[in-house]
Amino acid sequence: WIRTFSCTDGNERSPVVAREFGLDTMVGVCLGEDHAMNEIELASGIAIARAGNAGILAVGNEVLLRGDLSEDEILDYILRAREAVPGVPVAYVDAYFLFEQYPRLVEACDVILINCYPFWESCPAEYAPAYMREMYRRAQAVANGKRVIISETGWPSRGEAYGEAVPGKENAINYFIETYLWAQKEDVDIFYFSSFDESWKTGDEGDVGAYWGLWDEHGKMKYV
């Protein structure tokens, strides 16, 4: 599996290429404050799904967390997508705790997609895997029996500390290993964030935002 975060600006090609290599894609429809752009994204996501190139259609990512749209607006996009592609699982991505607060979103989604970041909750690295597992259990408790997928989790290898959460290569690789050992044992599906470092993200998250990848921005594996 791979995951995308948009269906425009060339991102609509990624699921096609992934399919050629035998990979499924969780196709992300980017939603925000620009309603006209949302319509373009949704139409492109639906087209990708109808072409058989979406294993899951994820309509929106952390939209409530950012405060870009209301719950009712997000539900409208989700329901329109479900009507357009009835054979494809349709869902919405956000922080795990928001599914506790918005049960109508749980009802509208075919699967529950949760982002789990102990780092951004100032959790010390040694306790982070256990805290991530607790996030998952909390989402499971309100999922009404639906499949819960961790759509994002990770730990940065460099940058400034966030409270008691300290970046570093050792902390990052330990988090990765413990996360995947647990996921394999418990049969939990995870999209790890992320494949590559992204230098452009420093504007939003400070210097730590650039260093969440397993590979650096030049494609070199960081943990060898």
Where are these regions (language model features)?
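Alpha-helical scaffolding within the catalytic cores
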Residues: D9-R13, M37-A47, D94-E107, R133-R137, ...
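Substrate-binding cleft of extracellular glycoside hydrolase catalytic domains
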Residues: E12-A91
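Aromatic-rich peripheral "rim/lid" segments of glycoside hydrolase catalytic domains that contact
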Residues: A161-G168, W182-V224
